[in-house]
Amino acid sequence: MALTQGPLTFRDVAIEFSQEEWKSLDPVQKALYWDVMLENYRNLVFLGILPKCMTKELPPIGNSNTGEKCQTVTLERHECYDVENFYLREIQKNLQDLEFQWKDGEINYKEVPMTYKNNLNGKRGQHSQEDVENKCIENQLTLSFQSRLTELQKFQTEGKIYECNQSEKTVNNSSLVSPLQRILPSVQTNISKKYENEFLQLSLPTQLEKTHIREKPYMCKGCGKAFRVSSSLINHQMVHTTEKPYKCNECGKAFHRGSLLTIHQIVHTRGKPYQCGVCGKIFRQNSDLVNHRRSHTGEKPYKCNECGKSFSQSYNLAIHQRIHTGEKPYKCNECGKTFKQGSCLTTHQIIHTGEKPYQCDICGKVFRQNSNLVNHQRIHTGEKPYKCNICGKSFSQSSNLATHQTVHSGNKPYKCDECGKTFKRSSSLTTHQIIHTGEKPYTCDVCDKVFSQRSQLARHQRSHTGEKPYKCNECGKVFSQTSHLVGHRRIHTGEKPYKCDKCGKAFKQGSLLTRHKIIHTREKRYQCGECGKVFSENSCLVRHLRIHTGEQPYKCNVCGKVFNYSGNLSIHKRIHTGEKPFQCNECGTVFRNYSCLARHLRIHTGQKPYKCNVCGKVFNDSGNLSNHKRIHTGEKPFQCNECGKVFSYYSCLARHRKIHTGEKPYKCNDCGKAYTQRSSLTKHLIIHTGEKPYNCNEFGGAFIQSSKLARYHRNPTGEKPHKCSHCGRTFSHITGLTYHQRRHTGEMPYKCIECGQVFNSTSNLARHRRIHTGEKPYKCNECGKVFRHQSTLARHRSIHTGEKPYVCNECGKAFRVRSILVNHQKMHTGDKPYKCNECGKAFIERSKLVYHQRNHTGEKPYKCIECGKAFGRFSCLNKHQMIHSGEKPYKCNECGKSFISRSGLTKHQTKHTAESLKTKFNVEKPLDVLLTSGFK
């Protein structure tokens, strides 16, 4: 589809002839020329593109020998915007003088008569009536301007008409020059010749004639434009159908009408005498060559007095000055919106018609303007013809280059009158000003959401359609926005073009650099009204407020799960699709989002850039550092709406909520077991597969969990370099030593809010809290019994299997749990590291010391809800509560009798043992038999 690009001027559609060329045309061609040029002018005026200059020359008519007079008509409008001058020039050979008269509304004007071989350059009313002589011209030339009355009134109130500059217009000695009424839009010029002794009269039509002229019975259904004759309507409709049946054999250009093709073909038959010495381009007029040369020289002779900006063309300066004056002379009849340029109005009017005639051949996308199509096609071709002379960066659009160059210059000429903020582009200023007005004229048809910019609406609509037209050539990933594709490509290239002036850190995106700079300035302007927390960006505050409101506006279409951030929803959807687009080059592990890959890469590098200012602990992720700091501050911003419990982390709150809902969304397909967390399901699945997906390429080990791989990477040899100065025990990690030393020092920094009990680690505190919440997330598959701790469940499972893997080397006794073996071994060594400060009694286990100390303090923190009785140990409370519930979980296999405690069952089972011995040895005292026989 051959369509023109850019704003159209009258020069683009005008064909000019020299005297020799004009003589070579036959009368039919001359008549055709007049008709076409007049029609072109009408069309330009209708589109709001007012030509700078239009010249019509009527060649000499007749022969002076036969009594006919030769005459030439020239209509010209100068470039100045507030003055439009038209001139009539008539060459006279046999006349002595001339009187000239025209009407302007109800006022008559007369010009001074002119004698033969004299010039007349007059203004309206400049000459007196006495100067007018009685002898008149033999022929009459009448120009009738047909227009609407409202348009006539509009033009009559504007400006003034003044004489032609003689330095620009050369007039023959035997010619008359006089300003005429300006030509109005939709003008029609009727030229007639009479051989009578009358004044030369230029008149406007009467009101009756205007009524008759306005009748246009043929209307276009596409745009509503009306025509007087049906042939004009047929020609016009080709604009909508884009049909161009008339094609030039020379260059292939197509036209709606045959007459336009005829005029166009003259271009090929005549020369272009003005050639550029730099690039060889040729032009028909010298003025065009002069303007073109400025593109090579960079000359910008037209300077703005307000801001000093320079331009190569005067009309560009005139348009620019409207920024300062605020003038917007072009108004849309549909919505009343005004524009600085007629071309902008033309572009805007397509919004109302919905017409998008320009289509991309590759992806089928349609556009309102050809320039937009050309820019769009560069996405497919990758063409970037505009290069920055300073840094060499290339761009697909000249506007992007202009915007980029302001980075080097720092120039921000566009200032907001409301708040004083400055911008590099006028479009950015226009967008910014909507913040003050609050205007959001663009509405989504699907969800009725409103936007301040059309581009924002277009981006939003892709969330409904799912359209992702921008594809990465490296990995095939698709995106809904070009900016996302550009940012994504930097993952492959490693490019980080945005550098911080303060610390030198580089970023892939400008927005990340802006966010980073706030670290140096510490500027946080947006404060939360609920908790007082401040943020550097309003978007961060909006996201934070959802924590308090519980708003989760983003819903998964597959499982119905809701999220408070759109990014979280996008990552969640990959669970259903199985997509893991981010792969580690070191070990081949794949991830659903880039942040997980970035964190994982630090396992290989060992990098931990985030350090706690309080305790010096380092982290490989900023989120982990933020979470860690809450240990010191005690901050718990996440509260459960059901029970009011508060949490330090949102993940803990989400996990806790499932206690109330009973939700277990993660189900094993093999055995049907369900879990509240996906990580728990992942760990469980390894039981069935036996898979160890986390491989160490350095030392060859394989692990079930990534955390174990990370732990192994930190200490692959199993070395324990960290030694306790109190007891000599060694640890592989400093954290293990830190927790251990608290046993000696008695430091317990973690306190339970419910009962005040203190603990030396967060994990112990977390386990303890389940006592108050009643949470028992670990269930036995064999008997259905639930437990608060995973270790307790593991210990319980050995009851069913009978497995006792931990054997004492001293006495050979076996145990189900390693911790019990450790405590047992202290009986052989006599080691009792936990000593009571009150009475000096020592204990093997710290828990025994804690229980013992309650004898001195009288503390009984565990209280029965039923009867109010308090206990020093939780196990005692458990046993007591069975009295109220009637539960007896320990059953004797011999007689079926049940007991509240294991000790009660053990005591009971000795009765059966004694009875069997009594029967076997037939004695009354089986204990004596046991002592003498040694249990044989």
UniProtKB/Swiss-Prot annotation:
It holds the Pfam family KRAB. InterPro entries: C2H2-ZF_domain (IPR050752), KRAB (IPR001909), KRAB_dom_sf (IPR036051), Znf_C2H2_sf (IPR036236), Znf_C2H2_type (IPR013087). The keyword Transit peptide does not apply. Its main location: nucleus. It is found in: Nucleus. Gene3D superfamilies: 6.10.140.140, Classic Zinc Finger. The keyword Transcription applies. Residues 8-83 form the KRAB domain. GO terms for molecular function: DNA binding; zinc ion binding. One of its GO terms (biological process) is regulation of transcription by RNA polymerase II. Keywords: DNA-binding, Metal-binding, Nucleus, Repeat, Transcription, Transcription regulation, Zinc, Zinc-finger. One of its GO terms (cellular component) is nucleus. SMART domains: KRAB, ZnF_C2H2. SUPFAM superfamilies: beta-beta-alpha zinc fingers, KRAB domain (Kruppel-associated box). A zinc finger (C2H2-type) spans 218-240, 246-268, 274-296, 302-324, 330-352, 358-380, 386-408, 414-436, 442-464, 470-492, 498-520, 526-548, 554-576, 582-604, 610-632, 638-660, 666-688, 694-716, 722-744, 750-772, 778-800, 806-828, 834-856, 862-884, 890-912. PANTHER family: FINGER PUTATIVE TRANSCRIPTION FACTOR FAMILY-RELATED, GENE, 19965-RELATED. May be involved in transcriptional regulation. Belongs to the krueppel C2H2-type zinc-finger protein family. This is Zinc finger protein 836. It comes from Homo sapiens.
